[in-house]
Amino acid sequence: MSEQFILQPGQLSLLSIKQILDEELSCVLAENSFELIRASHQTVKKVIDEKKTVYGINTGFGSLANQTISSDCLKELQRNIVLSHACGTGKLLPDDVVALILLLKINNLSQGYSGVRLELINALIALFNHKVYPCIPSKGSVGASGDLVPLAHLSLPLLGEGEVRHQGQVISAEEGLKLAGLKPLELEAKEGLALLNGLQVSTALALSALFISETLFETAIISGSLSVDAASGSDVPFDDRIHQIRGHQAQISAASMYRNLLAGSQIRESHRHCNRVQDPYSLRCQPQIMGAILHQMQFVGQTLQVEANAISDNPLVFAEQGDILSGGNFHGEIIAMAADNLALALSEIGGSAERRIALLIDKNFSGLPAFLVRESGLNSGFMIAHVTAASCASDNKALAHPHSVDSLPTSANQEDHVSMATSAARRLHEMIDNTSTILAIELLAACQGLEFHKPLKTSPQLDKIYQSVRSVVKEYDKDRYFAPDIEKIKKKILDKEFSLLTLTNE
């Protein structure tokens, strides 16, 4: 078993989530949560013993909430909700996302507001620790009442139903339970609904996208700085005085990143007193653009950290007062809006990078050979690589359409306004692929542009990036098969090889 992480329910930070996933830590539930969990479960049992009618415990669900269920059918009711709601479609969610969903669901249930047994939570922990990941189709949730469909698929294996993935192989739930040291569970009152109600899928998809987007943000700062040097651009627009008087801290921070990266460039010094007085906006306004993006990403991070610890079940059990209350914490509007904001940020990262590629290949602006290759005409150079970047940028603009405004009523109009949080978060991963492609092309184009400035060199910091690119992709002295080069640089980007932290630590 791997190194352990003691989970204090409701106290996950973004940093701890990254650590748990990156280091593949095992989860151990803090013992001080046990009594809260037991008290919550006892509150549910008391409702049954006293023959009270409470939604989700002894009633139907959704628009069937007015149907009372007899006490001898309560276990069947909970099993039925899992089976009937497991109707997702589409590609399976990747293992890293499913691991995060499990972690968030464990964190949610173990806070003692859902009325489930400790045995159920321990079963989820066993799946997480043994890397037995339920097969969850990516489509089917509208983000209210929670992520019902995908969370039903998460829950199926606990009943011995469905399939799981272990070490990349899809196997039966029965085999998966054995690997985790488990047997099929018989759900008790409220437990099926507690497993299904919640926004852990939307939150996990959004968090996963945020973590990768942070890497893309840093890469874009680096690739944009390289483009400034390759295009003989000016570093004057990054002067701290300009940004201090506007006052936005994220913009001030972004400008500092550009100054640090470009410091010591021989190329910059060679044309410091030239006649060109202003650069195009995609070079000159990078701190303003990337500062706004950083601000949005910080907001998204703050929102998702709260949501990672939020109770999004319904109904909610308040054991101390003996109350079980129905509300609407399962509505994912805030996640949908956060995902929409992150989509805007990703679109702008890719869109501004595409514009810089266009500048670099234009000999009339950059002063470099047409399409960044000698003997242009015989060679097409970066002509069509830019077309690929433009295609990806255009895709992102369409994908950035806000999902939070796109509600459709469900469940016979009982659930008449939904958030679409899951689709809002899911599309971010397609945007990430597009954006990483654009940034890979910009890195290749900017490094190719540097070739024409030799023997002058870029800054020491940016030269490290140049050398990293050249370690897997050689200079373009003539046309060759281009696609593999883009994929090599995309891999480096997603492996976090072009990060500001990496440069700082070298």
UniProtKB/Swiss-Prot annotation:
A biological process term (GO) from this entry: L-histidine catabolic process to glutamate and formamide
GO terms under cellular component: cytoplasm
Pathway where this protein functions: Amino-acid degradation; L-histidine degradation into L-glutamate; N-formimidoyl-L-glutamate from L-histidine: step 1/3
Cross-link for 5-imidazolinone (Ala-Gly), residue positions: A144-G146
Catalytic activity line of the entry: L-histidine = trans-urocanate + NH4(+)
Gene3D superfamilies (UniProt xref): Fumarase/aspartase (Central domain), Fumarase/aspartase (N-terminal domain)
Family matches, as InterPro entries: Aromatic_Lyase (IPR001106), Fumarase/histidase_N (IPR024083), HutH (IPR005921), L-Aspartase-like (IPR008948), Phe/His_NH3-lyase_AS (IPR022313)
Listed EC numbers: 4.3.1.3
Source organism superkingdom: Bacteria
Alphabetic keyword roster: Cytoplasm, Histidine metabolism, Lyase
Residues carrying 2,3-didehydroalanine (Ser): S145
Pfam families associated with the record: Lyase_aromatic
Modification note: Contains an active site 4-methylidene-imidazol-5-one (MIO), which is formed autocatalytically by cyclization and dehydration of residues Ala-Ser-Gly.
Stored HAMAP family: His_ammonia_lyase
Name assigned to this protein: Histidine ammonia-lyase
Organism listed in the record: Legionella pneumophila subsp. pneumophila (strain Philadelphia 1 / ATCC 33152 / DSM 7513)
